[in-house]
Amino acid sequence: MGPDRRIVAAKPRVHEVASELGVDSKIALAKLKEMGEFVKGPSSSIEPPVARKLRAALEAEGHLPGAGGDKTAAQASPAPRPPRPATADGSGAPKPQAPMSVAERQAAAEKAASEKAAAEKVAASEAADAKPAAGAPADTAKPSSPPRPSGVSAPRPGNNPFASNQGMGQRPSAPRPGNNPFSSSQGMGQRPSPSNIPRPAPPRPGSPRIGAPRPGGGQRQGGGGRPGFQQRPGSAGGGAGGGLQRPGGAGAGGFSGPRTGGGGGRGRGPGGGTAGAFGRGGGKSKARKSKRAKRQEFEMREAPSLGGVTVPRGDGGTAIRLRRGASISDFADKIDANPASLVTVLFHLGEMATATESLDEATFQILGEELGYKVQVVSPEDEDKELLEGFDIDLDAELEGESDEDLEIRPPVVTVMGHVDHGKTRLLDAIRSANVVEGEAGGITQHIGAYQVWTEHEGIERAITFIDTPGHEAFTAMRARGAQVTDIAILVVAADDGIMPQTIEALNHAQAANVPIVVAVNKVDKPEANPAKVRQQLTEFSLVAEEYGGDVMFVDVSARNNIGIQELLDAVLLTADAGLDLRANPNKDARGVAIEAKLDKGRGAVATVLIQSGTLRVGDAIVAGTAYGRVRAMADENGDPVLEAAPSRPVQVQGLSSVPRAGDTFIVTEEDRTARQIAEKREAAERNAQLAKARKRISLEDFTRALEEGKVEALNLIIKGDVSGAVEALEESLMKIEVDDSVSLRILHRGVGAITESDIDLATIDNAIVIGFNVRPDVKARERAAREGVDVRFYSVIYNAIDDIESSLKGMLKPEFEEVQSGVADIREVFRSSKFGNIAGVIVRSGTITRNAKARVIRDGVVIADNLAIESLRRFKDDVTEVRTDFECGIGLGKYNDIQVGDEIETIEMREKPRV
């Protein structure tokens, strides 16, 4: 049997496939749903691979093609061809077939396919025996055709109603102009031929035909008769084209491969365009396909379909690595798919997104599970590592390649952590003999400070680098970015307060960073101090003091009275010497981390950096996060200029293009261009990650519900601060505020430095509130804000800003109302009035009855009428506004008259419910 020709359309519809198999469309739709295909209805078109899968599934259940299928197949495709005989030895019998007429095709719907094929084969064989074919020399040369006697070059006129030489005797002629609207020779009296080849003359009887098949040749592309029909054996090759046809041409009278040597007729071969004496169009003409087109066609045929689109599938274990903030286009490039198809698949999964929109990891996980891929979103550290490897920078390889001769001892880096107001900064002031606390607003540390202190330990002057953090936010951010800058953590606990929630949180962060801890029990000079209680409480968190048999050093100190400071420094150095290998290579380009950064009006971007390895010098090209530039000047914590900084040395660096974030790593590059390119790529990656983070996932149901209920309220903010660490801590704290799903918080812009006109312009466009943290607007920005009515708020304490924003968010919530009973009256009498209707004579049993109040009528404890209004309220023929308990009055309920003696009238009012 030939190939399956039941599907004639490129994308058949569901009802066509169902009709072909003789099943109901609902059964086909149910089967498609079981197969995981998303199809709306019977008129939906499906891809050919899906149609094949559907047909195979239905046939496997016993739904074989019946009457409906026969009819569809007969109307949609030509008659099936008989099997070809073997032609290897050249002795096989010919395969003559007579073309089917219109009547035959109509009758085919009523007969069985096997009976049709047998009848046609017998009729064709008899006709072939009666009329031997002409052109014996050419036919003899063809292996698939037996030798034929030459003598008659054309069949008897009138023998074949579909032959191109019908009624023309032995002389073939061109098709009549206008007979076939699809013919290439329409309106012309001659057959088409190439311009450089003369038009062939009609063949003489007994002479070889011009259009005879080539020896051993097969079918030309696009040649042959009508689909499913073969030329009559021995008919003259009167059709235009023939052997002189260009490759890929579709002239009438082409040949159908190794089947017969006939050539007359206007039809085309399988896949041809023009066909039939009555102008019935055949299939689309096929040109010669390139290898790429054939490969794409094969891949499309083999690819599975989902949601009406064709997408490649994985085996469930194929890993796809994506960067943060990747889009559907990036995922499509990884799996070699069409982004539009993935958008459709994601839509059917309940997620709406564009092809270029940055998506979060959860969305890619859903899409990957559906398609059989394991999606892995690289972490920020791995992403930055891969980015640097693109510039031939491998920090891990540098550390592994260092030998012991290159390493030198460096000072330990110590981070002071603890609960708010437990004396962290006061302790550092005592160590440095300074007074930083007085400079902080409210006595709360809101900046990160880095200092280096020299102390004498066992007769040797040694340096210790201290980092003072504002609570735990900055330390969390550093740990999240892999900036392990801390060697030792000092946990400050007040002896009078003991363990507090933030103490536990700081302890957890220090243990997660895997750094040794030294506990400083502060405020031991207070009368209510209880250091033993602190030691006992910390044993629950695996911090056992040495005097209790543990390995953690506890030191009792008093920062105010300068008690135990030297003992604390000795404990830090002993802990560092006992369990840490504090060495670094100073003889290479500097590597480190930005501790803090700010925008100075005279000096520009100033970053406090801590060198971890190498030596930083003035003039080096440096990149820190998304900021880059050359080191123009360096200074220590006291403001003294520094020409070079060794490992574990904190310095202030000037010359960066922008303000880096707290915790950003910095490296020294050979050229400014390299630093700029790294910064630009980091900025692009960070922007995509922020877009994916800010994107709110919404399902189709949520989207419909939002449309019905109205838009979601949003509070837009612009944050400007003096240092990047404070801005970041404020942003993280604000994003943690949870009020209600109907109100959202959007931070449009955050930055370091004074409030500028551009900030006011952005706030004007998006109706945003500008928050200035320890910064003020310039004169022009202040005037612009007053003119545009932009709300600009200034804060110096971070907690005040958080409280105000939370109050603003609660104020944006839609008020919640609760129903409160205001009064109850019993009906004692009903007065009927033709003008006012029924009037209830009542006595107020409790509360107050107010005119125009909402009311309901209760009869035997059942509400029989609700949402009424007290339209009239009278007492002794006087209109009154309210009637109190134990007083009588008359109540008119407007058009509602179904009241009886003994009913109750209850008045209610809606009061706004205060939010907790």
UniProtKB/Swiss-Prot annotation:
Annotated GO CC locations: cytosol
Positions with biased composition (Low complexity): 120-142
Keyword S-adenosyl-L-methionine assigned: no
Coiled-coil ranges per UniProt: none
Region annotation G4: where it falls in the sequence: 522-525
First-listed, main subcellular location of the protein, grouped into a coarse class: cytoplasm
Keyword check for Cytoplasm: yes
Region G5, residue ranges: 558-560
Biased composition (Pro residues): 195-206
Region described as G3: 468-471
Superkingdom to which the source organism belongs: Bacteria
Record protein name field: Translation initiation factor IF-2
Gene name linked to the record: infB
